[in-house]
Design a protein with these regions (language model features):
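Terminal, low-structured helical/coil segments at or just beyond the last alpha-helical repeat
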Residues: 3, 9-12, 284-326
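N-terminal leader/linker segments that initiate helical-solenoid repeat arrays
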Residues: 1-50, 57-62, 66-69, 73, ...
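Canonical tetratricopeptide repeat
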Residues: 50, 84, 118, 152, ...
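Eukaryotic tandem repeat interaction scaffolds
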Residues: 179-271
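Structural signature of tandem alpha-helical TPR/SEL1-like repeats
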Residues: 24-33, 58-70, 91-104, 126-138, ...
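Structural marker of alpha-solenoid helical repeat scaffolds
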Residues: 40, 74, 107-109, 142, ...
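Helix-start (N-cap) detector for alpha-helical repeat units in TPR-like alpha-solenoids
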Residues: 10-12, 45-46, 79-80, 112-114, ...
């Protein structure tokens, strides 16, 4: 056996061992073994691809993107690497790069449910919900068990206010995968919206049984408890959520609501303003902040904040501005 053949054999051995570690979720060891495989055979495109997948599991998307680019350089016809790189580009907010990769492989992937899922995600990131829904529809025609397509389509329906269709998608997703956290979370939020607060708490508890440190479920369960009048239990849950993710605008808003309901208006205002400073959309935040300012007899500041809320289609801000600022 020549040196070259021996190196390729060694590379293949490392690759198989790496795949075993990957399946066992030992991603650090898998990464080391993929590097060994690439070191033995620098043109081993599958090893680059799997190394990229490994880096994604380790929450290193920028590194994954570079490795996937190497895979495509080694084998420009390796369309699977383009698809994974498109997904990675989406995570990194590189929408044009994701679009370019998807265009390159469109013909080869015309019957791929995953391709249409990724393209649907791209359209959603671009703010094109109708294109997104169309691609999720196609993904589900090709694979009716595509849980991510169900959840993501449901999320768009939810944002559009089509609660019935959203609920159906989330329930269908859970019928396939009962541990699907986004579906459980969104059904919990819908239950809050419908004032079915015990149902909501049950959904969030199902998430917390799977992962006791899920910041969104802790916060949302806390919000349900605020609505139920269980203020102290609510504050503990929201506080734990903020320990895990201090920049969750919804948790800051909810802590503000807790302080407001507890008669601590100054502390409530501090939390609301922290949420506003993050500059991410949070339902009813501007409306609630303005109401608190008005209670403190600062009508000018209240009207100013409501005016900002109108731009964000905050229903409380719209109603309060109409009532108090004309």
């Amino acid at each position: 056996m020549s040196c070259s053949e021996q190196s390729k054999k060694d590379a293949a051995d490392f690759f198989l061992k790496a795949n075993q570690s990957f399946v066992q979720k030992n991603y650090t060891e898998a990464l080391r073994l993929y590097d060994e495989a690439i070191d033995k055979n620098p043109e081993f495109s599958d090893a680059y691809l799997n190394k990229g997948l490994c880096l994604l599991k380790l929450n290193r998307p920028a590194d994954a993107y570079e490795v996937l680019t190497e895979a495509i350089k080694v084998d420009p016809s390796f369309v699977q690497a383009n698809l994974v790189r498109a997904e990675t580009a989406l995570v990194l907010g590189k929408l044009i790069d994701a679009d370019n990769d998807l265009r390159v492989i469109e013909k080869e992937y015309k019957d791929s449910s995953r391709f249409f899922l990724v393209r649907g995600n791209l359209s959603d990131a671009k703010g094109q919900p109708s294109l997104s829904i169309s691609d999720y529809d196609r993904a589900l025609q090709l694979d009716k068990a595509n849980v991510e397509a169900l959840v993501n389509r449901g999320a768009i329906y939810y944002k559009q206010g089509d609660i019935v269709l959203a609920q159906k998608d989330f329930k269908d997703a859970l019928a396939i995968r009962p541990s699907q956290i986004e579906a459980l979370n969104n059904l919990g939020l819908i239950a809050i919206h419908e004032n079915k607060l015990d149902d909501a708490v049950n959904m969030f508890d199902r998430i917390l049984n799977l992962n006791p440190a899920n910041a969104f479920a802790l916060n949302n369960k806390g919000y349900a408890y605020l609505k139920l009048g269980k203020l102290e239990e609510a504050s503990k849950l929201i506080d734990r959520s903020l320990d895990i993710d201090p920049r969750n605008g919804y948790a800051l808003r909810n802590m503000g609501i807790y302080y407001q309901k507890s008669g601590q208006a100054d502390k409530a205002l501090i939390e609301f303003k922290k949420a506003i400073d993050i500059a991410e959309p949070v339902d009813e935040l501007y409306g609630l902040t303005g109401k608190l300012l008005l209670e403190k007899n600062d009508k000018v500041a209240a009207c100013k904040i409501w005016k900002q809320g109108i731009v964000l289609k905050d229903p409380i801000a719209i109603a309060e501005f109409e009532k108090n600022c004309k």
